Every structure is written in structure tokens, then in C-alpha cells.
């Protein structure tokens, strides 16, 4: 005898129920306008609610949310069912999109990396990642349709209740989904509930097609010729089988289910706001149902008063040493509490029942999860009971039809006032998951996949992102991980690395990118004086541009050069600025370039347009030496012409057509570093502006070098301008910094705050306590978030996007880890592996 069969035998059996078809078990008569008509004449509405990250809100915000929820409970339908369903995260759409993009990828290195990324998503999705859906279920309050309640009246009443719910849940921060086809959406919810296992392999649309084909074939109908016969809704959503023969579990669609309820007297005297979060986030295979029934206020007061009088009469005949005396005295005290709450605080009385559904693939796993759930609730001072020999009643109760079993209701119901009922607010398990985005990691609170699409203009006002973290928190690792995954999605990535640029080289080479080193003696050069064609043919076609009517390209370039020279010569006088401006115009004039835009082209009609030969710093140096007032500038510029940095005195010899480009500035020291960053930014910015139809991202590591105390206002303004306007060019500006004091060091932090305010997305890694307090107001962090951030381990972060915040554990595939790790032990292991492969 196998262990499984032995366990099942021990579980005990009862006489099998006579159930011919599973379709007959589902009490659905019709589904129209998103309203379910049940076989017993009730009308049900199911709404899906998007959760919020309740537990990361401040105490004040939590209180306001619960108050808004309590306000709605006062006017809500009398009977309510709140339902949460937990299941394995479905990453199929995201993976399918990645595979489709991989098919068009030309780089073999990128294809290989994409396969590793897909394996990571599958692995995390199958082992760790969960997703949760939340539902509000209410009904038309008349039990049966009568002459005075036609279907139009029923629809109108339910629609009004839905609109009220939307308004109040919006105050809580929750969005109620509005599907294009309410009937299809409701049917999909029911199909998912009854077919938890099958819905993974056979989506609802596939199930519908199969049922239609089978029905047509069974009735000898020809598809495309004969009309489709009427098919009951239950046929589309019914599971393949339901086994109701066991005392302590059922089997439905190949999964094992068991049911628990919190006893009516099994609650603690006080609970915290959001206490349901512990149940909701308990893990895989745990669903929660909360039933609320609001009592008539005037009748309740009369009943409570009558009960108090009766109990006081009984109490007089008892001795105070009796065991029942204390119980009766407590009942009287509770009665006064209810009466006072209703009369003085405008509260209602509710009857509440809470059910927990436990599911698993095997009986042993089911029993283990069930015990874990029982122990967890016990630790919260809540006591549960098993629905032994009542499994069918329990299943009918937790079905999304708002039909609680009277027997189970009697055992589980607990009377609560509005404030107590509001504490059951369960829509707290927020997920940040966009199928079109890139995976960042796993949500620490609920194990859901955290997939963020920075470029989703429907959700984000801009795609900008700030990365903040102390040294060693994983800032560079996270930036590279984000860049690699964007590259896999076909997004153009430019990385500017002013410090430790070598950390970016390995990943750049492995993905087939271009590594450009800007430094004295480097073979790479970007001519700072080059005027570039910044509009692609596609944008010329879209905008119908006429270059002759555009602002002067020469004037724009000179403006950029003035920023460059202000970084090089911070103490330049107004007179020197004027003389420099004139010298620049004369230098370009020698090459035939004027304020006439046509003058910058050698062949305007070529594809791409061919530009004239541009002057270099040496040409400007010659012009500066001719004027006594600019000789000081000429002396400083000579370093780039005849001195140690003469490698800057060349025509541009790098190509930015590669989709993954790293500009390494780490060899530039002192004053040369901000100058080099300006050269790199100027070049990249011109490329970004050329085509607004393509996604691109510019990533600036250690941005404090440009906007911090060691920079100047003009450079900071240029950098801020990028963050302000890059959205209009289809791009994202991503910055990273670890020195927060310098980040906010220029002009009392004006530029640091402005860049953060112009970035709707943030990744906050571990910060020191003083750093966290320093940016608390700027980042609008709560005390809870500050406490979490200061305790983060390496690779943990708080993701802030679209006014939502999620704590995540950042995940990388084996291939990505090898490409971007800087950990000494991991590098040593990689070296040994490569040496063994070489041998």
C-alpha cells in the first residue's frame, strides 16, 4: 500500500455523493451584462479590485484608508463577500513577448543572454513567484424576482452599487477594473476559480473554442454553416471533476482542497489595521473569504437592549462565584459597547465570517499547509476549526456566489461594529507587474514578480529613474542589470561611467556592445566641436521639417561649448566669455559654417546627410592666440592641443550606432572628469534627439559629478534639462549616485531635488540612517520605509513607481551574474571555471 493511499484511508471516507455532472454543481442559470443569475433566483455582481501597498503607508494614511472603507460599508449592499485568490505567477505573456523579440535580434550574444533571462523568469515563476487577485461580490437584495422588480431595475440597482464602490475604493487608493466585456471577464474569473490547474495549460478562450467544437460535433452541426446551438454557461467553466467523498478534503480539477474557518469566539479583543495582510500573504495555496452582513440599525438597538435586560435579570439570580457569572457579565458589557457604538458613534452592526481555503497538489502537502496556516493564526490569537464532514458546504460557501452555508455561518459568525468590519480591508497585497517591462526581482512582501515598464506612458508621466544607495549596496550591479535587460528588449542604452568604468567592460563585451574610453592617450575621441545632424529621416517625414527654418545649429552648438568651457575654466570673466563666443564664430567661419543651417552640410540629400569637416580644438586654439584677451583661455586649452590631453584634439572616430554603448571616463581626474562627462553627454544627447520613435535610455553613473558641489550651474542646468525634456524624445534618463551630500551640494540641493522630482521612478537600495533621514522629505518616505531601507541587505531595494512602492529582492540569471558581478569570491570562481574549460 502506498503512502498516499494510506494517508487517504486514514483521512476516512463517507458515502459518495450522487453528482452526475460537475456542470450541475455550479448554480449558474445565466450571465448577462456582467450579472450572474443563479439557479435559485439571485443576481450576483463580481468586481475585481486592484490592491495597494497598504503596509508601507504611514499610520496616518492607513487610518484614512480604513476610514474611507468604513464609510463605504455604511452604504454598501447588505450582503458582501470579499475574496482573495493566490496562485503561481503567470509569466507566459512576458516570456512570449521576449521570445518574439529574440527572433528578430541580430546579436548572437544578446540572444544567448535572453535565453538565460527567460530561464530565470521560468525558474523564479515556478518556485517562488505568486500572484493574487481580489474580488468584491455583492447581490441584488431581493431573494426572488417579482412583479415590481424587472431585470432593468435589477441592473440599475447593481450598477448604482458598483458606482458607489468605485467612488469609495478610489478614496482608499484602489482601482476597480472596468473590463471591455464584463460577461467575458466574469466568466474568466469563474473558470479560473473552478479550474485552478487547467487554466494554466488551457486559457479560457481555448476552453470556449473546445466546448463549442465538441458541442457542434456531438449535434452533427457543421462549423461555419450551421448556427452554434445554445450552450449553458456552466459548461464553459465547470471543472473536469469534483470528488466530494472525503471527510476533510475535496479534489477539484486535480487539486486537493481543504477548508478552515475562524471560530466565532476565536478572535482576539483587538486587531491592528490591515491584519488581513498576514492571511493574504501567507503563501501559495491560501485563499481567503470574508463575509459581512449588515444588520438594520433600529432593530439592532431594540434587540441589544432586550438582550441586556434579559441578561441582567439572569445575572441577579446567579452567585458571583459561578463560572457563568463572568461570561454573562461580559455579554452585558459587550451589549452596552454595541449599543453605545450604534447610538453615539453612528456605527452599524455586522455579522462577520472568515473562511480560509487551503489547496495543494498532493494530500501530504495539503495537510502540511493546513497545519502551517493553523499555527500562524494561532500565533495571531485566532483559533480555527476544520470543516470536517462539511466539505461540500464549505466549497459552496467559498464559491464566488455569496451563498454561505447556514450551518457554517452559525459556527463562524462574529458580531462587529463598522470599525471592526473595516479592519477586514484585505486589498493590501500590491503587485508591480507589467508584461511589457523588465524583471527587477521578487516582491519581498508577497513573492510576486516585480516587472516594471518605465516607458508605459499610460502609467508613468516619464521614464526617468533615480538609483540611490550607499557604497556596496549593489548600485552599479542594479544599473547594469537594468541596462542589459533593456538591451534584450531592443532598447538603445548609453552608459556614462565616470568612476570604475572597468566594471562595465565585461558585460559590454559579452553582449556585443561598444566600449568607448575617453581619456588622455585613448584611441577613442569625440570631437566636442562637431555639429551633428540630429534629426532622423523618420522624424523629418513625421514632422515635415525644413532645416532652413529651424533655429541656428551653430548657435545651439556654441551654447553647448560655453558650458564645456565653463567647466574647464570656472573663473572665466564676462569679457572672456564674449571674446570666446566671437572666436568660436570665426573658427567655424573658416570651415564655411555660418548661422545658415545649410552651411553645415556637404551633401544635404545624402542618406544620412553628409556633414562638412568640422573644426577641432586646435583650430580654436589658433584663433584664441590671436587676441590678448583670450590668451589665458588659449593657455588652458593648449593642454588639449599639445599637452597630455591632446588625444581630444581629433575628429570623432567612434560610432554610436551600437545598441549598447559604455563611455568610460574613469581615467579622467580632477577638472577633466566633469569636462569629459560633458563631452560624452553632449554626443549622446545629440543621438537621443535624432529619433523620437525609438526607445532609448541614457544612464549616468555617479551623477553628482555633474550636479554636485564640485560642478557648476551651467553643467547642472544642462543635466537637468535632459531629465526634463528626454520624455519628448522617447527616452529615459537614469541616474545613480552614492554620495547624497554631494548630490544635493550645489545651490542648496536645488538640482538634486529637481532631478528627483523629474524622475517618476526610483530604486532605493540600502542607505545609512543619516542618509535616509537626509532624503526622507525629498523622497516622501514613511518611517516604515526608512526603517526597511536602513536594514536592506545587498541586492534588496525599494522600487518606487507610479506613486506605488514595493520592496524587492533583485534577481539575476547565472549569465547576468557572471557578466556584472564585482564580488571577489564570485570572480575567483568564474576564473577557476574558465581555467578548467581551457584545460
Question: Can you describe what each PLM-predicted range is?
Answer:
Residues 2-427:
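Extended, folded cores of ATP/NTP-driven motor/assembly subunits in large transport
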Residues 512-516, 749-764:
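A short helix-turn-beta junction within AAA+ P-loop NTPase domains corresponding to the substrate/partner-engaging
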Residues 475:
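Conserved lysine of the Walker
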Residues 472:
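Walker A (P-loop) phosphate-binding loop of P-loop NTPases
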Residues 25, 35-36, 45-53, 59-78, ...:
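P-loop NTPase motor domains
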Residues 478:
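Hydrophobic positions on the alpha1 helix immediately C-terminal to the Walker A/P-loop
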Residues 467:
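Hydrophobic anchor at the beta1->P-loop junction of P-loop NTPases
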Residues 781-835:
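Conserved P-loop NTPase
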Amino acid at each position: 500500500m502506498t503512502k498516499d493511499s494510506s494517508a487517504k484511508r486514514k483521512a476516512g471516507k463517507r458515502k459518495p455523493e450522487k453528482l452526475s455532472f460537475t456542470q450541475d454543481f455550479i448554480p449558474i442559470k445565466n450571465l448577462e451584462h456582467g450579472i450572474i443569475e443563479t439557479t435559485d433566483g439571485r443576481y450576483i455582481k463580481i468586481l475585481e479590485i486592484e490592491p495597494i501597498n497598504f503596509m508601507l503607508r504611514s499610520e496616518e494614511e492607513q487610518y484614512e484608508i480604513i476610514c474611507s472603507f468604513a464609510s463605504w460599508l455604511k452604504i454598501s449592499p447588505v450582503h458582501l463577500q470579499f475574496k482573495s485568490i493566490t496562485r503561481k505567477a503567470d509569466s507566459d505573456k512576458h516570456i512570449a513577448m521576449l521570445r518574439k523579440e529574440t527572433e528578430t535580434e541580430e546579436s548572437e550574444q544578446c540572444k544567448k543572454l535572453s535565453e538565460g533571462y527567460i530561464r530565470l523568469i521560468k525558474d523564479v515563476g515556478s518556485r517562488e513567484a505568486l500572484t493574487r487577485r481580489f474580488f468584491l461580490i455583492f447581490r441584488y437584495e431581493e431573494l426572488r424576482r417579482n412583479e415590481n422588480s424587472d431585470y432593468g431595475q435589477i441592473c440599475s440597482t447593481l450598477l448604482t452599487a458598483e458606482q458607489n464602490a468605485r467612488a469609495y475604493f478610489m478614496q482608499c487608493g484602489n482601482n476597480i477594473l472596468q473590463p471591455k466585456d464584463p460577461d467575458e471577464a466574469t466568466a474568466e474569473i469563474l473558470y479560473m476559480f473552478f479550474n485552478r490547474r487547467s487554466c494554466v495549460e488551457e486559457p479560457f478562450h481555448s476552453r470556449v473554442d473546445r466546448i463549442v467544437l465538441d458541442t457542434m460535433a456531438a449535434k452533427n452541426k457543421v462549423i461555419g454553416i450551421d448556427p452554434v446551438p445554445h450552450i449553458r454557461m456552466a459548461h464553459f467553466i465547470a471543472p473536469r471533476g469534483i470528488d466530494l467523498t472525503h471527510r476533510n478534503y475535496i479534489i477539484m480539477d486535480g487539486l486537493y482542497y481543504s477548508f478552515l474557518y475562524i471560530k466565532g469566539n476565536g478572535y482576539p479583543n483587538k486587531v491592528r489595521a490591515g491584519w488581513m495582510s498576514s492571511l493574504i500573504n501567507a503563501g501559495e495555496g491560501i485563499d481567503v473569504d470574508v463575509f459581512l452582513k449588515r444588520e438594520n440599525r433600529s432593530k439592532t438597538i431594540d434587540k441589544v437592549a432586550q438582550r441586556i435586560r434579559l441578561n441582567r435579570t439572569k445575572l441577579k439570580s446567579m452567585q458571583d462565584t459561578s463560572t457563568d457569572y463572568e461570561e454573562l457579565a461580559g455579554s452585558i458589557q459587550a451589549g452596552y459597547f454595541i449599543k453605545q457604538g450604534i447610538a453615539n458613534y453612528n456605527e452599524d452592526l455586522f455579522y462577520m465570517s472568515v473562511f480560509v481555503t487551503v489547496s495543494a497538489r498532493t494530500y501530504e502537502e495539503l495537510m502540511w499547509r493546513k497545519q502551517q496556516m493553523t499555527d500562524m493564526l494561532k500565533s495571531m490569537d485566532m483559533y480555527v476549526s476544520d470543516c470536517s464532514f462539511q466539505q461540500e458546504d464549505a466549497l459552496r460557501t467559498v464559491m464566488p456566489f455569496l451563498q454561505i452555508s447556514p450551518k457554517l455561518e452559525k459556527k463562524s459568525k462574529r458580531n462587529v461594529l463598522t470599525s471592526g468590519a473595516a479592519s477586514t480591508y484585505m486589498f493590501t497585497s500590491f503587485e508591480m507587474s507589467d508584461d511589457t517591462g523588465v524583471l527587477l526581482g521578487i516582491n519581498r512582501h508577497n513573492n510576486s514578480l516585480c516587472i516594471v515598464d518605465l516607458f508605459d506612458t499610460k502609467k508613468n508621466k516619464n521614464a526617468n529613474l533615480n538609483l540611490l544607495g550607499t557604497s556596496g549596496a549593489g548600485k552599479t550591479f542594479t544599473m547594469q542589470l537594468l541596462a542589459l535587460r533593456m538591451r534584450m528588449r531592443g532598447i538603445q542604452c548609453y552608459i556614462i561611467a565616470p568612476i570604475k568604468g572597468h566594471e562595465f567592460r565585461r558585460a559590454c563585451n559579452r553582449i556585443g556592445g561598444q566600449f568607448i574610453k575617453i581619456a588622455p592617450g585613448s584611441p577613442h575621441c569625440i570631437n566636442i566641436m562637431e555639429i551633428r545632424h540630429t534629426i532622423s529621416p523618420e522624424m523629418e517625414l513625421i514632422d515635415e521639417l525644413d532645416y532652413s527654418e529651424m533655429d541656428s545649429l551653430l548657435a545651439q552648438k556654441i551654447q553647448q561649448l560655453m558650458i564645456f568651457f565653463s567647466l574647464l575654466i570656472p573663473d572665466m570673466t564676462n569679457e572672456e566669455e564674449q571674446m570666446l563666443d566671437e572666436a568660436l564664430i570665426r573658427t567655424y567661419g573658416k570651415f564655411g559654417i555660418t548661422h545658415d543651417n545649410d552651411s553645415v552640410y556637404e551633401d544635404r540629400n545624402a542618406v544620412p546627410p553628409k556633414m562638412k569637416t568640422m573644426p577641432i580644438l586646435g583650430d580654436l586654439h589658433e584663433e584664441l592666440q590671436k587676441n590678448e584677451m583670450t590668451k589665458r583661455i588659449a593657455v588652458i586649452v593648449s593642454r588639449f592641443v599639445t599637452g597630455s590631453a591632446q588625444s581630444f584634439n581629433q575628429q570623432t572616430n567612434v560610432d554610436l550606432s551600437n545598441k549598447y554603448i559604455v563611455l568610460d571616463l574613469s581615467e579622467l581626474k580632477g577638472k577633466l572628469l566633469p569636462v569629459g562627462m560633458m563631452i560624452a553627454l553632449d554626443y549622446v544627447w545629440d543621438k537621443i534627439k535624432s529619433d523620437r520613435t525609438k526607445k532609448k535610455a541614457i544612464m549616468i553613473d555617479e551623477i553628482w559629478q555633474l550636479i554636485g558641489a564640485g560642478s557648476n550651474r551651467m553643467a547642472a542646468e544642462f543635466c537637468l534639462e535632459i531629465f526634463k525634456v528626454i520624455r519628448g524624445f522617447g527616452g529615459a534618463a537614469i541616474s545613480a549616485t552614492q554620495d547624497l551630500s554631494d548630490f544635493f551640494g550645489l545651490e542648496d540641493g536645488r538640482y538634486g531635488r529637481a532631478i528627483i522630482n523629474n524622475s517618476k521612478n526610483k530604486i532605493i537600495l540600502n542607505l545609512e540612517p543619516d542618509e535616509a533621514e537626509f532624503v526622507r522629505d525629498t523622497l516622501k518616505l514613511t518611517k516604515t520605509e526608512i526603517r526597511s531601507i536602513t536594514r536592506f541587505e545587498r541586492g534588496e531595494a525599494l522600487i518606487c513607481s507610479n506613486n506605488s512602492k514595493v520592496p524587492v529582492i533583485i534577481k539575476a540569471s547565472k549569465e547576468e551574474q557572471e557578466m556584472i558581478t564585482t564580488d571577489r569570491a564570485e570572480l575567483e570562481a568564474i576564473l577557476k571555471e574558465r581555467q578548467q574549460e581551457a584545460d
